[in-house]
From Swiss-Prot:
This is Eukaryotic translation initiation factor 3 subunit C. It comes from the Eukaryota. Residues 165-189, 217-243, 289-301 have a biased composition (Acidic residues). Belongs to the eIF-3 subunit C family. It is found in: Cytoplasm. HAMAP family: eIF3c (MF_03002). PROSITE patterns: PCI. Pfam families: eIF-3c_N (PF05470), PCI (PF01399). Coiled coil: none annotated. Residues 674-850 form the PCI domain. SUPFAM superfamilies: Winged helix' DNA-binding domain. It comes from Xenopus tropicalis (Western clawed frog). One of its GO terms (molecular function) is RNA binding. GO terms for biological process: formation of cytoplasmic translation initiation complex; translational initiation.
Length: 922
């Protein structure tokens, strides 16, 4: 018999269950009233009427749980999906939220999720490890959350100020615990009270800490809830006994309940009382803890509050036992013990450096000699270099300062002790650290320390923001670095080998070649204006950088046995010549070295140095007015479109997919520090202006030449981009200025061309960056006038029968000898079919230039000839005859026409006839 139909006490129900009773048969047919028989599943469930608020909030909390789980495993795709669902669920609960207010747990999630996404976004290494879907979802979710949180700025700010749980959440947790306890009571009816209590005590509180995540304050609250759990269970027992008295039969308990307004108010009142009791218990517990502390204080000494995180003052480790005699062998043995831990896993590198400093102090206190001091200093500097195991990690400021100071101290000791010899060839067994009767011998290489120090300085500059004050402060250390290198150079010149001297010379060159010597430049400009005594004083102040570079490089040319050091020295020497406008010396050195023939076999840093040298050579040629040489020097770098990468000044984003992380790290280590960069906008402007001065006259001379070649593809590309624009406004960028100037030069309008190239905006961007800006501007104006004259003559020569050179000089503001020289060159090179009448200073045109109609007819005839030739070849191929079009009998007519053109001059223009005869034997 089902126990739900049994009435009476618990003992009666148990006795009825023990016996086998027979159910009475119902009276009537099969369609009569059947007794209500519930299944086992229905026995364990309870129908409860839930409010809309509970349903909506439960939906929100379930979604929040899913989001937090996804946050733990860094599943951004799942986070994004659930966040979108959460937004939809919140919109559904809008009516309830308007009445009750935004729930605290919802604000907590928005705040936590925002902090979590910001932390992920700043973690660059973690972002690189994400797959594509997660990275995309992270970016999308971050944007959506920032936009979504604008509506909740005030609640989120209030929550961040006081992230404690609100009373509403406590009430919600009490409701959940009450509901769970009541459901357990109903399902376990018929059991003994002792069994029920045991089950209630052992049951885990499922609803407790429902919304708690990570905060320490909330963890404390959860612990206090654990302490109060017993009292909550007692309250649930009393509520359960009250519920049992309400129902007269078991079946009535499981029928749907109708809740009236009075019952609801009573339930709310009961919840408030529970919350008050809970708060009272917390206050009481705190008071009891305070009393216990007072009792402890009365019984013993006073307790003192100590702030967490205060570092304990550690005693310095004892290097030697008390009473030990400090001798050089003992110190060397201790030094070897410290060095044995070097490089091992788990070794505290900072502590190791401190131990070495402490050992150096002990050796100095006991006057153990300079040999021991030098050996310890060598190991201190080496330990500073080994502090960062990762090659890409740069040295911190305090470590860098210690490194410089240690190297300075080491050099001081070496200069003070002339009887000391150091070198890598000295073995540890043959070292002499303390016997002053013989020369001191220490194993070590000062040059290796200097080179590593220079590399560390480069890494520091590479990893510092170039637009910050920190970069300027770090750059000031270069003076100390150069001082260390200069002192090492003096020491190695006395005691070093030729190979070591070449290496230290190269370090000195690398810190000198890219710097413009303003003092030498000023002395050069003021030569003849100063008295002889002032000149002698200026020469004695400091060695001219040109003399220094010449002396260092020539020593390397003569003594070096490795190709790499000699190649770097030659390139730096050329760069320095070009930087100081010594064009011919730089050009001759480049041509004599033949570096352009085998530079592709050099390592990448040397190739970067070669590219920088060629660029500086081209800029120097431009400043000197050698436009064609400047264009040729810059052509390879600019035509590739990768000038930034080839010069070692950054990586291109479009090539980032072609390299993995290791290759990217290697290429970043090859980058040149910012203070050594070449201005890329200046470089491009110099190249485009050079191309304009060469290309525009050439285009005018070969306007109707179908086979004309392009001097600069990049310049033509810029022209096409300018022509494709539907609406042309005033030029803004540097490229637009050059394109506008080119169009003006095509028309022979040199003044407009000059105004586009030389104006206030272009001066600020480009021309003022040159040391002698005014001289460069005057050179540019002169070149624009000359090339505009050539372009004008090419374009309008068919219009004139003759023209006076005085008129041309007035048009382009050139002297008559200059105009005469330009026109004479054009006639000699067969670019202009004309002759000069010296008495009248007139240019007489020969009139052999074809008109536009004749040029069109020539082009049509040429295209028809090509068409006929192609048709004849196709016909011969189909017929099986391979004699070709050139073997046919009608060739004599064309030969006669070509002979006429050769003898009479014909109507072919300028040098086009000669080019045609050389390219095809028609």
């Amino acid at each position: 018999m089902s126990r739900f139909f049994a009435t009476g006490s618990d003992s009666e129900s148990e006795s009825s269950l023990s016996g086998d009773e027979i159910l009475p048969k119902p009276v009537g047919g099969t369609f009569g009233k059947q007794p209500i028989i519930l299944s086992d599943d229905e026995e364990d469930t309870k129908r409860v009427v839930r409010s809309a608020k509970d349903k909506r909030f439960e939906e929100l909390t379930n979604l929040i749980k899913t989001i937090r789980n996804a946050m733990k495993i860094r599943d951004m795709t799942k986070c994004l999906e659930e966040f979108e669902q959460l937004g939809k669920a919140f919109i559904k609960a809008k009516n309830i939220v308007d009445k009750e207010g935004v729930p605290r747990f919802y604000i907590r999630l928005l705040s936590d999720l925002e902090d979590y996404l910001n932390e992920l976004w700043e973690d660059k290494e973690g972002k690189k490890k994400m797959n594509k879907n997660n990275a995309k979802a992270l970016s999308t979710l971050r944007q959506k959350l920032r936009k979504y949180n604008r509506d909740f700025e005030a609640p989120i700010a209030a929550y961040k100020q006081n992230p404690e749980e609100s009373a509403d959440e406590d009430q919600e947790k009490d409701e959940d615990s009450e509901a769970s306890s009541s459901s357990d009571d109903d399902s376990d009816e018929g059991m003994s009270a002792s069994k029920f209590l045991k089950k209630a005590d052992s049951a885990p509180p499922e609803s407790r800490s429902k919304f708690l995540k990570k905060e320490e304050a909330e963890d404390e609250e959860s612990s206090s809830d654990d302490e109060d759990w017993g009292s909550d269970s007692d309250e649930s027992d009393s509520d359960e006994s009250d519920d049992e008295n309400k129902y007269t039969s078991m079946a009535s308990r499981f029928l749907k309940k109708t809740v009236n307004e009075g019952d609801r108010q009573a339930a709310e009142k009961k919840k408030e009382e529970k919350a008050k009791k809970k708060q009272h218990r917390k206050v009481k517990r705190k008071d009891e803890e305070g009393e216990e502390e007072e009792d402890d204080n009365e019984g013993g000494g006073e307790w003192e509050k100590v702030k967490g995180g205060v570092p304990l003052v550690k005693e310095k480790p004892k290097m030697f036992a008390k009473g030990t005699e400090i001798t050089p062998p003992i110190v060397v043995k201790k030094l070897n013990e410290i060095l044995q831990a070097r490089g091992k896993k788990g070794t505290d590198r900072a502590a190791q450096i401190d131990l070495l400093h402490l050992l150096a102090g002990i050796a100095e206190e006991n006057n153990l000699g300079q040999g021991i001091a030098v050996k310890i200093k060598f190991n201190i500097v080496a330990s500073l270099y080994d502090y960062n195991t990762n090659l890409a990690t740069y040295m911190k400021a305090d470590m860098w300062k210690k490194c410089l100071d240690s190297i300075h101290d080491l050099l001081d000791i070496l200069f003070a002790n002339s009887n000391m010899f150091i070198g890598e060839h000295i073995s540890e067994d043959s070292e002499n650290l303390s016997n002053t009767d013989q020369p001191l011998r220490v194993r070590g290489c000062i040059l290796t320390l200097i080179e590593r120090m220079d590399e560390e300085f480069t890494k520091i500059m590479q990893n510092t923001d170039p637009h910050s004050q920190e970069y300027v402060d770090n750059l000031k250390d270069e003076a100390r670095v150069c001082e260390v290198i200069e002192r090492a150079q003096k020491y190695l010149q006395e005691k070093g080998s030729t190979e070591e001297v070449c290496r230290v010379y190269l370090r000195r060159i690398m810190h000198t070649y890219y710097k413009f010597d303003y003092k030498a430049h000023q002395r050069q400009l003021s030569t003849g204006q100063e008295s002889k005594s002032e000149q002698d004083q200026a020469e004695n102040e400091a060695e001219d950088s040109a003399i220094l570079m010449d002396r260092l490089c020539k020593y390397i040319y003569a003594k070096d046995r490795t190709d790499r050091i000699r190649t770097c020295a030659i390139l730096c020497h050329i760069y320095h010549h070009a930087l100081h406008n010594r064009w011919f010396q730089a050009r001759d050195l480049m041509l004599m070295s033949h570096l352009q023939d085998n530079i592709q076999h050099a390592d990448p840093p040397v190739q970067i140095l070669y590219n920088r040298t060629m660029v500086q050579l081209g800029i120097c040629a431009f400043r000197q007015g050698m436009i064609r040489d400047a264009h040729n020097a810059l052509l390879d770098i600019q035509s590739s479109g990768r000038a930034k990468e080839l010069l070692g000044q950054g990586l291109l984003m479009r090539t980032m997919q072609e390299r993995n992380q290791e290759q990217e790290k290697i290429e970043k280590r090859r980058q040149i520090p910012f203070h050594m960069h070449i201005n890329l906008e200046l470089l491009e402007c110099v190249y485009l202006v050079s191309a304009m001065l060469l290309e525009i006259p050439y285009m005018a001379a070969h306007e109707f030449d179908a086979r004309r070649r392009m001097i600069s593809k990049q310049f033509h590309h810029q022209l096409r981009v300018g022509e494709r624009q539907p609406l042309l406004g005033p030029p803004e960028s540097m490229r637009e200025h050059v394109v506008a100037a080119s169009k003006a030069m095509k028309m022979g309008d040199w003044k407009t061309c000059k105004n586009f190239i030389i104006n206030e905006k272009m001066n600020g961007k480009v021309w003022d960056l040159f040391p002698e800006a005014e001289r460069v501007r005057s050179m540019l104006i002169r070149k624009i006038q000359e090339e505009s004259l050539r372009t004008y003559l090419f374009t309008y020569s068919s219009v004139y029968d003759s023209i006076r050179m005085g008129i041309l000089g007035d048009m382009f503001q050139l002297e008559i000898p200059t105009v005469h020289s330009i026109i004479s060159k054009m006639i000699i090179n067969e670019e202009l079919m004309a002759s000069l009448d010296q008495p009248t200073q007139t240019v007489v045109m020969h009139g052999t230039e074809p008109s536009s109609l004749q040029n069109t007819a020539l082009q049509l005839a040429e295209k028809l000839g090509n068409l006929v030739e192609n048709n004849e070849r196709i016909f011969d191929h189909k017929q099986g005859s391979y004699g070709g079009y050139f073997n046919r009998g009608d060739r004599g007519d064309r030969d006669q026409k070509d002979q006429y053109q050769r003898k009479e001059g014909g109507y072919m223009r300028r040098g086009y006839r000669r080019d045609q005869q050389g390219q095809s034997n028609y």
